């Protein structure tokens, strides 16, 4: 069971996504991700921020950010069953008014009708190689700015993003997962 770790909805249980295409971020990794974002050298301000959750799955990362004070979240997920779970989780937690859910392939984004993101969570399926294409698409569509912090979860053995317009800020390992943080170059 996935629970909210902190903030105004701390302890609330999220509906999990049973789709075989969805792999939830572990609680330990999710906690580390938010500790790194809001502490240390990244020093992100979640309060009032605009977050984008790419490959959103159950929406746990975006919902966690909303619980911790983010002002708005956009969830991008192509699996219809996962989209239903995201919608249900946002409604149960009273976040529906603060969210938009796009049922689309994150790598096929061609236009962006929202503000530039403050924080982007990118949790593509492990070993898929989809993180960089999705971030490139969102960047070309106008969703990433110079101050946007991008948090990417990959399998520990996968290489860091390379060949794109992104600069690595920090990288940490948690079990089989790697969390890497980037900004535009």
Regions found by a protein language model. Name each.
Residues 1-185:
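Class I S-adenosyl-L-methionine-dependent methyltransferase catalytic core
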């Amino acid at each position: 069971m996935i629970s909210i770790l902190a903030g105004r909805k701390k302890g609330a249980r999220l509906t999990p996504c049973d789709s075989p295409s969805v792999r939830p971020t572990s609680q330990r990794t999710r906690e580390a991700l938010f500790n790194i974002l809001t502490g240390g050298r990244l020093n992100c301000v979640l309060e009032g921020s605009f977050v984008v959750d790419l490959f959103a799955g159950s929406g746990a990362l975006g919902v966690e950010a909303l619980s911790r004070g983010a002002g708005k979240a956009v969830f991008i997920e192509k699996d219809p069953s996962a989209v239903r779970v995201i919608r249900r989780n946002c409604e149960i937690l009273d976040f529906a008014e603060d969210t938009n859910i796009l049922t689309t392939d994150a790598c096929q984004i061609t236009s962006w009708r929202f503000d530039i993101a403050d924080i982007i969570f990118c949790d593509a399926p492990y070993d898929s190689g989809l993180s960089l294409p999705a971030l490139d698409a969102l960047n070309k569509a106008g969703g990433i700015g110079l101050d946007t912090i991008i948090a990417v979860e990959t399998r520990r053995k996968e290489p860091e993003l390379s060949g794109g317009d992104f600069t690595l800020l920090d990288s940490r390992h948690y079990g089989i997962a790697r969390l890497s943080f980037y900004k535009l170059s």
